[in-house]
Amino acid sequence: MNGVFTVGDLKYLARTGRLSGTAAVIGNVLSIKPILRGNKDGYIVQYKKCRGRKSALNELISLVCNNIVEPEKQIIGIAHADAYEDSLYVMEENPENTSKVRGFINTSYDFCTGSHVGPDTIAMFFMGNDRELQGMK
């Protein structure tokens, strides 16, 4: 199982100690949106940095397309924290590889998880080759 996500505001990562306060302020001013994932050891690690929200959402879609295994047998999970419109965008923006999937499950984060990542967070979950995603920077 692979999971990739992006956050809307870096201050929530700073509040939980995953990012320094200075980096969060600078990142927010420059509209930098990190793409994060869980690694094999269960830690959240940065995969890539994107400039702007749409760029980050498109990168999530690209990661799923490039790493999904047997898409016709899969249901892709999408979780969001008050980002319903963005969750619809990633469902409808179907490149060739995700247009073959059986379907999507779209849900909102629970309060506990949502408080750690903040509003406008969106994640995608899928079965892939390995948790080491192709294209790792």
Go through each PLM region and give its residues.
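Mixed-charge interfacial surface used for oligomerization/domain docking
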Residues: 1-137
